[in-house]
C-alpha cells in the first residue's frame, strides 16, 4: 500500500517536472501561415484593385486645400508586424515558463495535501 502511494507520488512529481519542460520546448521550425501574411479576400471574386492611380494628373492650379492638423493617433507610427514566421518573443516565453512553474507548484501542493489527508486517517 505504501509502495503504491509512493509510486503514485513519484509519477506525479515526474510528470509535474516533465510537462513544463515539454510545453516550453522549441516548436516546429516550419513557419505556419499567419493571418497577416494571407492575401485579402475580395467578396466579389475580382482581382485586387489599386486605390491610387499613377496615370492621372490633376490640372488644379493654386494653393492646396487646407487640411486640419493630424490627430495624435495619426502621428503614431504603425506597429511593426513580426515577420519571423510565428516565433515567440522573450516576454511570451517568460510568461509560459512562469505559468508552467505555477502549475508545477499547484500539483505539488495537491500532492502534499493528499499525503497529509491519507497519512492522518
Curated annotation (Swiss-Prot):
Expressed only in cartilage, including nasal, knee epiphyseal and rib tissues. In proliferation and hypertrophic chondrocytes, detected intracellulary and in the pericellular extracellular matrix. In primary spongiosa, detected only in the extracellular matrix. Its main location: membrane. The keyword Transmembrane applies. Residues 25-92 are extracellular. InterPro entries: SNORC. Residues 1-24 form the signal peptide. It is found in: Membrane; Cytoplasm; Secreted, Extracellular space, Extracellular matrix. Induction: In chondrocytes, induced by BMP2. GO terms for biological process: cartilage development. Keywords: Cytoplasm, Extracellular matrix, Membrane, Secreted, Signal, Transmembrane, Transmembrane helix. The chain crosses the membrane at residues 93-113. It is a single-pass membrane protein. Plays a role in the regulation of chondrocyte maturation and postnatal endochondral ossification. May inhibit cell growth stimulation induced by FGF2. Interacts (via the extracellular domain) with FGF2. This is Protein SNORC.
Amino acid at each position: 500500500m505504501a509502495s503504491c502511494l509512493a509510486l503514485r507520488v513519484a509519477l506525479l512529481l515526474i510528470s509535474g517536472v516533465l510537462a513544463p519542460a515539454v510545453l516550453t520546448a522549441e516548436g516546429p521550425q516550419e513557419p505556419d501561415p499567419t493571418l497577416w501574411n494571407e492575401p485579402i479576400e475580395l467578396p466579389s471574386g475580382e482581382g485586387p484593385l489599386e486605390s491610387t492611380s499613377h496615370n492621372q494628373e490633376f490640372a488644379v492650379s493654386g494653393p492646396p486645400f487646407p487640411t486640419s492638423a493630424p490627430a495624435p493617433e495619426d502621428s503614431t507610427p504603425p506597429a511593426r508586424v513580426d515577420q519571423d514566421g510565428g516565433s515567440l518573443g522573450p516576454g511570451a516565453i517568460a510568461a509560459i515558463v512562469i505559468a508552467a512553474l505555477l502549475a508545477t507548484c499547484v500539483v505539488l501542493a495537491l500532492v502534499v495535501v493528499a499525503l497529509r489527508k491519507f497519512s492522518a486517517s
